[in-house]
């Protein structure tokens, strides 16, 4: 979707000047993977409007294929408005209801060519938007699973998009069982499973067929990993002196972790790369501006 970022500090409803960007957890992930040199296709649906064209132009400019970005003549492209803050989390307003993507349907997926596809990344956000969108994401994950494609799933909870906590947990957990890698934050895991500690949260998903559970512990607490063969790892985070914008940190972690897995690195090294890219992302304003190239990543990890 498109993102209107306030150019002045203050409540969104009182401001007049905004700059237009492109955002979204899945898009941030696609940008990050492309910057690391991976061949990336983006799956979405946009309106026939300036925001939709802006998104497609942005994808092409970042080397991301838009063959699977379908258009909808009858519904608009969704967008967000985000406050400008000096530090910490900004307030974000979502305009998502009745958008083109909320009318995403399983039939839209018929044109996908799975030849040569190694990995699919999904977040829980689309599952909240509509019943048809939910059915489409389930279908996408089942088809990828059937083709032997590795699937990573970041719950990326947005409680304000759901009718209730109970529905959110049920739907997110139903989707998670199709994934090979599930990557919740610690508080997300608690909310979704009712479990308190990271080991039990991981066990909840492992019992449902997930192969690897990666729990982002938050702040300086690093990452906890548990696998289906009951291997456990703890990987520290990187220290950041000045946090500019925390939005996109989780997407950066997902980029680092899954790209490292695709490169054949160990789970521990994958978590280190994820932590590094997450740390780089929060030092720059914007959702994906801080996502690095391989060269920038190498310099950061060498100097950290």
Model-assigned labels for residue ranges:
Residues 39-124, 298-304:
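Conserved N-terminal subdomain of the carbohydrate kinase-like
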Residues 119, 125-204, 221-222:
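Conserved beta-alpha-beta core of the PfkB/ribokinase-like small-molecule kinase fold
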């Amino acid at each position: 979707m498109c993102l209107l970022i306030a150019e002045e500090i203050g409540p969104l409803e009182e401001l007049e000047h905004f700059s237009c960007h492109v955002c979204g957890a899945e898009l941030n992930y696609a940008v990050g993977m492309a910057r690391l040199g991976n061949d990336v296709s983006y799956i979405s649906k946009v309106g026939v409007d300036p925001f939709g064209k802006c998104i497609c132009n942005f994808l092409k400019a970042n080397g991301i294929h838009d063959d699977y970005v379908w258009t909808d003549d009858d519904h608009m492209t969704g967008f967000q408005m985000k406050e400008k803050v000096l530090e910490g989390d900004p307030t974000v307003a979502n305009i998502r209801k009745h958008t083109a993507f909320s009318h995403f349907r399983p039939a839209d997926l018929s044109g996908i060519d799975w030849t040569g596809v190694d990995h699919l990344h999904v977040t829980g956000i689309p599952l909240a938007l509509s019943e048809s969108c939910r059915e489409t994401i389930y279908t996408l994950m089942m088809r990828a699973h059937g083709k032997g494609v590795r699937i990573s799933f970041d719950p990326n909870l947005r409680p304000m998009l759901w009718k209730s906590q109970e529905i959110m947990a049920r739907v997110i957990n139903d989707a998670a069982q199709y994934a090979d890698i599930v990557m919740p934050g610690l508080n997300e895991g608690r909310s979704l499973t009712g479990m308190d500690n990271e080991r039990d949260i991981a066990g909840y998903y492992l019992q449902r067929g997930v192969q690897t559970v990666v729990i982002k512990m938050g702040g300086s607490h690093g990452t906890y990993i548990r696998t289906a063969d009951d291997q456990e790892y703890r990987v520290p985070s990187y220290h950041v002196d000045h946090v500019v914008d925390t939005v996109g940190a989780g997407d950066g972690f997902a980029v680092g972790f899954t790209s490292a897995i695709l490169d054949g690195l160990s789970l521990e090294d994958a978590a280190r790369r994820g932590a590094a890219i997450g740390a780089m992302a929060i030092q720059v304003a914007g959702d994906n501006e801080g996502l690095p190239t391989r060269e920038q990543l190498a310099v950061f990890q060498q100097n950290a």
